[in-house]
Every structure is written in C-alpha cells, then in structure tokens.
C-alpha cells in the first residue's frame, strides 16, 4: 500500500504522534479499463473502515458542470449528484470515489479543487438547500479514476489546477 498510503495519510490523518492537522490532497488513478482501480479503492476503503461512495461519471456526462442535482439533464445524472451530495453530507468516515472521470466536463472536476487543498471545503446541495461542506479534521478522502483516453480516442487531459493538487498514479505503465 505504499503507493496509496502516503496520500491517504495526508487526507485522513494518521494516528499517534505523527498525526497531521493540515489534511489535504487528492488521489488520482489513471489506467486503461480493467486494471482494477475501482476494486482496489473499494478494498482500501473497506480496510480503513470508510464508507465507499462511488460516483459513476459516465452517467453525468459532459453536460453536468455543477454539483446541484436540480440542474442535472437526466435522472441518471441527478441520482449520481444526489449520491455525491449524500457522501459530502455524511462527512466523516467517507471515501468519495469519482470513477471514469474522462467522461465528465473539466469544469465539473474543478469543483473538487477546494477539497484537495488546505481549505477542504466544497459547495454543494443537500435536500434542495445550498450547503458549504467543511471536511477539515474529518476522516474524508477523495479519489478519482480514469482512462488515459476519452471515448473519441483522444488523450484525456486532467485540468491543470486539479493535477497540481493531486497525487497521480498511472497504473498502466
């Protein structure tokens, strides 16, 4: 687990004298389909006692740019956004996992920058009400996974502002 352990310790904190109070970070896994990214993260979440909240990004598509379920263009996207907001509302002991991020809009992915930096904040919606989620001091981790290529065959480009805050591992190399 050395590959993921340092990042998750940075996000969740560690126990004992080395406990970090400046929790931050984002874990990003890139590889072709079938390499086991989702299975790996489900296993890690289980071992760490975290609730695994998987967001199916292809259901969101490129039209979704906001976290508000009311703005979703279809019921599948709305359901995924409701699940995302539920994970944020639960707050502690959660691993939020965005799967197949190459199928989403870069503007949507950039909404998670605040969770990756020292502020550990994100704006969302809970039961129709705008809400600011503050994850500082909570056992909350965010991970994203994607394919290095988009559905059109082009190379997937991770937004720079997100890439600067993430530990990115290419499992396909």
Where are each of the predicted segments found?
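Canonical AAA+ ATPase core
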Residues: 118-173
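Pre-Walker A (pre-P-loop) alpha-helix and adjacent loop at the N terminus of AAA/AAA+ ATPase modules
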Residues: 1-25
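Conserved AAA+/SF3 P-loop NTPase catalytic/coupling segment centered on the Walker-B
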Residues: 89-117, 153-161
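Walker A/P-loop
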Residues: 18-55
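Substrate-gripping "pore-loop 1 plus following alpha2 helix"
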Residues: 7-11, 69-83, 108-137, 172
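AAA+/P-loop NTPase substrate/partner-engagement loops
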Residues: 47-88, 105
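Switch/connector loops and helix/strand junctions flanking conserved nucleotide-binding motifs
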Residues: 37, 61-66, 104-107, 150-155
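Short loop/turn elements that form and flank the Walker-type P-loop nucleotide-binding site
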Residues: 22-24, 48, 89-92, 136-139
